């Protein structure tokens, strides 16, 4: 059985191998502090300045163009300690924390976090130590949380578990066995109740609520499939296939009120991710645009592609930087 240290070494190798340095003027790298890595997901507050991202060792960083990265919050009291730095902090994710999915409640300013090993958390607008909401449902531990989004119409939080059988340190085992124990959950802040909405998902890595709150999309990384779960309307409470056209989808992010979504995608050959790309789909699951990103990230596992004010913010699981790609106005390359 793959040891945790071996898994970490492999993931670091995958993130750094085949690195290609792009001279594209529209692309910018923002290296995270050297003691941390893997800006996996992004969130943007109501000020519209900078962004927030979760990194290894259990920290949430805030980036402002004038100051760069600053500490905004931490998942545990240990997250600020030196032994949560570097590869040790990655190895001690069960103590330090590892934010995987983050999203703001746009009305309250609260930042919700799906921490991979430590459960669902919330952070006040002031930042600081996160408050744990829960690490289980119906008495069963989550094991491995991943994606998260907040319904912009109701404030209800939707989040996923990549697996209900394997923990983050066993991710390669889960992939090798094609584990299908992932779940989609709903957390209602008004009742403080967590509900299981979907089960039997294959590597449910990301989720995104539509701008009108009528449905939530759930990616199945292992199956190269995205499901749609209906929140409202005549199909409420049911699910269906949304698209099979995106290879190994990770996080999904809605694009404002356009009805479209960005999906982080790779081609997963055995355990080696290749050909990372950003894929835009519409509300019918049709692919509108594909942006190849191998020249900017090499063969690495993209975790998120998030559009904000004309830029794509691109994250990775273990990489040393956040990528920002300026979109060309009116461009929509055929794929």
UniProtKB/Swiss-Prot annotation:
Q: Which InterPro entries match?
A: 6-blade_b-propeller_TolB-like, Strictosidine_synth_cons-reg
Q: Which reaction does it catalyse?
A: 3alpha(S)-strictosidine + H2O = secologanin + tryptamine
Q: Does the keyword Iron-sulfur apply?
A: no
Could you tell me which pathway this protein works in?
Answer: Alkaloid biosynthesis; 3alpha(S)-strictosidine biosynthesis; 3alpha(S)-strictosidine from secologanin and tryptamine: step 1/1
**Listed GO MF terms:** hydrolase activity
> Which cysteines in this chain are paired by disulphide bridges?
none
Looking at the UniProt record for this protein, which Gene Ontology cellular component terms does it annotate, in alphabetical order? Golgi apparatus; mitochondrion; plant-type vacuole; plasma membrane; plasmodesma
Task: Give UniProt keywords alphabetically.
Answer: Alkaloid metabolism, Glycoprotein, Hydrolase, Signal, Vacuole
- Superkingdom of origin organism: Eukaryota
Instruction: Tell me, using the record's free text, what induces this protein.
Output: Upon potassium (K) starvation.
Give the GO terms filed under biological process for this record.
alkaloid metabolic process; cellular response to potassium ion starvation; response to jasmonic acid; response to wounding
Which residues belong to the signal peptide in this entry?
1-22
Q: Kindly report the protein's main subcellular placement as a broad class.
A: other
EC number annotated for this UniProt entry: 3.5.99.13
Cellular compartments annotated: Vacuole
The glycosylation sites are 80
The family line of this record is: Belongs to the strictosidine synthase family.
Q: What does this protein do?
A: Catalyzes the stereospecific condensation of tryptamine with secologanin to form strictosidine, the key intermediate of indole alkaloid biosynthesis.
Q: Which PANTHER family match?
A: PROTEIN STRICTOSIDINE SYNTHASE-LIKE 12, STRICTOSIDINE SYNTHASE-RELATED
What protein am I looking at?
Answer: Protein STRICTOSIDINE SYNTHASE-LIKE 12
* Species annotation: Arabidopsis thaliana
Q: What is the lineage of its organism?
A: Eukaryota, Viridiplantae, Streptophyta, Embryophyta, Tracheophyta
Primary gene name: SSL12
